[in-house]
């Protein structure tokens, strides 16, 4: 049976290939997902790269986590040597958005936070433009009106004490940052 081809708008990027590992076609993956089984459980995944923007199916055979590097090493059936693995550097690993795991109350898919307006004391101060996993997740917020010589963006720890309100329906979050976090 052929795997149905989801619409491009339905993709969820779960990681990026950052290089080859070894001589047998394994690749190193920087994960963007908090669900390790996406990189260890065999099955269909999709790749998209700048050289091939149309996603194509690959078969994940196995994967393992490298804790020191905070990366996964994965094996795809279609990649059998280092040269082929190196050619995938920069490619995104995708799954259909419909494959998102269900979440508990007050949990969010971090990618859903990108583009949300950020408010502090009722005033819009910026927009979430990125995410960084640094122990705790950090929201990269591009400031609307930064002071001269001030940073254009700041990193806000995504913890309930600092981000008490997330309203996905209204496309906004409210922050209560400690003194000095905002310029």
Curated annotation (Swiss-Prot):
GO BP terms, alphabetized: ribosomal small subunit biogenesis; rRNA processing
Location within or outside the cell: Cytoplasm
InterPro entries noted in UniProt: PRC_barrel-like_sf, PRC_RimM, RimM, RimM_N, RimM_N_sf, Transl_B-barrel_sf
GO MF annotation: an example: ribosome binding
GO CC terms: cytoplasm; ribosome
Signal as UniProt keyword: no
Annotated PRC barrel domain residues: 105-181
Keywords: Chaperone, Cytoplasm, Ribosome biogenesis, rRNA processing
HAMAP family: Ribosome_mat_RimM
PANTHER family (alphabetical): RIBOSOME MATURATION FACTOR RIMM (PTHR33692:SF1)
Domain notes: The PRC barrel domain binds ribosomal protein uS19.
Subunit organization: Binds ribosomal protein uS19.
Biological function: An accessory protein needed during the final step in the assembly of 30S ribosomal subunit, possibly for assembly of the head region. Essential for efficient processing of 16S rRNA. May be needed both before and after RbfA during the maturation of 16S rRNA. It has affinity for free ribosomal 30S subunits but not for 70S ribosomes.
Similarity section: Belongs to the RimM family.
Descriptive protein name: Ribosome maturation factor RimM
Organism: Thermosynechococcus vestitus (strain NIES-2133 / IAM M-273 / BP-1)
């Amino acid at each position: 049976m052929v795997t149905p081809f989801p619409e491009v708008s339905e993709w969820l990027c779960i990681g990026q290939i950052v290089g080859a590992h070894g001589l047998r076609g394994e690749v190193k993956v920087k994960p963007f997902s908090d669900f390790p089984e996406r990189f260890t459980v065999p099955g269909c995944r999709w790749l998209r790269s700048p050289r091939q923007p149309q996603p194509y199916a690959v078969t994940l055979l196995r994967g393992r986590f490298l804790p020191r590097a905070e990366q996964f090493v994965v094996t795809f059936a279609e990649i059998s040597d280092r040269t082929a693995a190196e050619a995938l550097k920069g490619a995104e690993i995708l799954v259909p958005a419909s494959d998102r795991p269900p979440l508990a109350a007050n949990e969010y898919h971090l990618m859903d936070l990108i583009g949300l307006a950020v408010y502090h004391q009722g005033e819009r101060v910026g927009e979430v433009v990125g995410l960084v996993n640094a122990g705790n997740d950090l929201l990269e917020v591009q400031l609307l009106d930064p002071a001269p010589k001030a940073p254009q963006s700041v990193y806000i720890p995504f913890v309930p004490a600092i981000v008490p309100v997330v309203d996905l329906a209204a496309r906004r979050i409210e922050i209560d940052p400690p003194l000095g976090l905002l310029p």
